[in-house]
C-alpha cells in the first residue's frame, strides 16, 4: 500500500456545491444568498455580536469584578431528614436507594443530608456530605453516618 492508494471510505465524502453555474445547477444566480445586502457580498456578514451599530449587549452589561467564591462549589442532591422519617429501622440510605424508592427523582450530584425534620429510627446513611445538625439527630436515634466519595473533606459543610 502506498500513500496515493489511500481513498476515503465510500459515502464519507460529498461533492462540493458549485455555486453560480446556472439555474439548472440548483445554486445558480444568487448562489443561495438571497437578494442583496451585506450578507450576500463576499466576506460574509458582520462579526458575531454586532447589533447594527446599537451598543451591543456585552458593552451594556457591567464589568465582572472578581470571581465569586461559589464558582467551584460542588452541586449536591439535597434532602432533609423529614423525607427519611418514613423509612423502616436499619435501612441503608444512599442516593441509589433513595432514587429506587422514589424519594429523590433527580440526580443533581452527590447526596447531602440536611437537618430539617426528625428521624426516630436508626438508619445507616451513606452520603457525600451531611450537616452537623443532621449528623447529631441521626446518631441520637442510634444510626450511623458514612461519608462516601471525594467530598469527605467538606463533611461538615
Curated annotation (Swiss-Prot):
Pfam families: Ribosomal_L27A (PF00828). One of its GO terms (molecular function) is structural constituent of ribosome. Gene3D superfamilies: 3.100.10.10. It comes from the Bacteria. Keywords: Ribonucleoprotein, Ribosomal protein, RNA-binding, rRNA-binding. InterPro entries: Ribosomal_uL15, Ribosomal_uL15/eL18, Ribosomal_uL15/eL18_sf, Ribosomal_uL15_bac-type, Ribosomal_uL15_CS. The keyword Protein biosynthesis does not apply. One of its GO terms (cellular component) is cytosolic large ribosomal subunit. Residues 1-56 are annotated as: Disordered. The keyword Transmembrane helix does not apply. Residues 23-35 have a biased composition (Gly residues). PROSITE patterns: RIBOSOMAL_L15 (PS00475). One of its GO terms (biological process) is translation. Binds to the 23S rRNA. Part of the 50S ribosomal subunit. PANTHER family: 50S RIBOSOMAL PROTEIN L15, LARGE RIBOSOMAL SUBUNIT PROTEIN UL15M. Belongs to the universal ribosomal protein uL15 family. This is Large ribosomal subunit protein uL15.
Amino acid at each position: 500500500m502506498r500513500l496515493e492508494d489511500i481513498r476515503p471510505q465510500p459515502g464519507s465524502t460529498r461533492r462540493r456545491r458549485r455555486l453560480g453555474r446556472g439555474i439548472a445547477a440548483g445554486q445558480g444566480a444568487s448562489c443561495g444568498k438571497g437578494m442583496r445586502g451585506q450578507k450576500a457580498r463576499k466576506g460574509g456578514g458582520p462579526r458575531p455580536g454586532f447589533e447594527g451599530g446599537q451598543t451591543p449587549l456585552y458593552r451594556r452589561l457591567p464589568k465582572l469584578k472578581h470571581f465569586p467564591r461559589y464558582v467551584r462549589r460542588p452541586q449536591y442532591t439535597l434532602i432533609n431528614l423529614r423525607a427519611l422519617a418514613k423509612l423502616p429501622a436499619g435501612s441503608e440510605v444512599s442516593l441509589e436507594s433513595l432514587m429506587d424508592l422514589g424519594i429523590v427523582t433527580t440526580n443533581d450530584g452527590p447526596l447531602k443530608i440536611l437537618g430539617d425534620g426528625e428521624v426516630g429510627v436508626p438508619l445507616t446513611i451513606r452520603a457525600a456530605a451531611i450537616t452537623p445538625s443532621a449528623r447529631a439527630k441521626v446518631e441520637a436515634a442510634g444510626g450511623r453516618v458514612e461519608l462516601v466519595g471525594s467530598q469527605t473533606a467538606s463533611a461538615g459543610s
